[in-house]
């Protein structure tokens, strides 16, 4: 049996995230569901697609990685052409490879990079409205960079997740947080070994509050130590977030 690795981009605007919903009678549209239906039709097999991780409803992805097992004898070129012909325009497979039998898109990930985009112009950019959070008030980038330093390293990020399970570890490592600003469009790239539910969006929401002067940069350390979701800020909107890169 072959193990096929695919890399894809998707605009998450119309989807309820990556992962398919298993409720009976559910008509929820997800990226995984769209792909599995095309692959099942192509191979006449019940394909189960393994994704590199979940993305929230409305979140986008570039270079998302998934894999699936198949007995199909189609060439890689035939497979990618078929998939892209039948997928909607907001999902596109960009690369396909034969993977080792043991390759697992989720469990083999060493780190992930997310990018969050903020439109900090007074008036919303029409062409970025689906891909950037419009924050009209001018942000203090220096304060945000100072606050971000407290998030670097290994911490218990319980304050920065919507996850309510008491059995799951909330310990994660943030390797880097980079800020890039150009014409009032701010990009925040966050690399870590893994992320909890809503973690990046809550981190960004908190950093924006620092940038607006609502909280001091050093208060982020207090938020981490509190281990209480209520201490952190509201999560940033989903549409500004994009899963950007994976390291295996």
Swiss-Prot record:
It holds the Pfam family PseudoU_synth_1. Keywords: Isomerase, tRNA processing. It catalyses: uridine(38/39/40) in tRNA = pseudouridine(38/39/40) in tRNA. The active site is at residue 56. One of its GO terms (biological process) is tRNA pseudouridine synthesis. Substrate binds at residue 114. One of its GO terms (molecular function) is RNA binding. Its EC number is 5.4.99.12. HAMAP family: TruA. Homodimer. Belongs to the tRNA pseudouridine synthase TruA family. Formation of pseudouridine at positions 38, 39 and 40 in the anticodon stem and loop of transfer RNAs. This is tRNA pseudouridine synthase A 1. It comes from Clostridium perfringens (strain 13 / Type A). The lineage of its organism: Bacteria, Bacillati, Bacillota, Clostridia, Eubacteriales. The gene is truA1.
């Amino acid at each position: 049996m072959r193990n096929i690795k695919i890399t894809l981009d998707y605009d998450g605007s119309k989807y309820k995230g990556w992962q398919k919903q298993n409720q009976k009678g559910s008509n929820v549209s997800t990226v995984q569901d769209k792909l599995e239906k095309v692959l099942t039709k192509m191979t006449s097999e019940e394909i189960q697609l393994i994704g590199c991780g979940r993305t929230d409803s409305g979140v986008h992805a570039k270079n998302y990685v998934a894999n699936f097992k198949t007995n199909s004898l189609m060439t890689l070129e035939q497979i990618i052409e078929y998939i892209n012909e039948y997928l909607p325009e907001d999902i596109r497979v960009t690369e396909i490879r034969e993977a080792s039998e043991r390759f697992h898109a989720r469990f083999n990930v060493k780190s992930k990079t997310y990018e969050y985009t903020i439109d900090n112009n007074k008036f919303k950019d029409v062409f970025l409205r689906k891909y950037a959070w419009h924050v009209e008030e001018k942000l203090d980038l220096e304060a945000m960079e100072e606050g971000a330093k407290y998030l670097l390293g290994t911490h218990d990020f319980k304050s920065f997740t919507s996850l309510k399970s008491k059995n799951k570890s909330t310990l994660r490592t943030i390797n880097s947080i980079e800020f890039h600003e150009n014409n009032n469009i701010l990009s925040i790239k966050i690399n870590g070994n893994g992320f909890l539910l809503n973690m990046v969006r809550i981190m960004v929401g908190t950093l924006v509050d620092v940038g607006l002067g609502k909280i001091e940069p050093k208060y982020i350390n207090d938020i981490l130590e509190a281990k209480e979701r209520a201490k952190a800020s509201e999560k940033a909107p989903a549409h500004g977030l994009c899963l950007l890169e994976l390291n295996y």
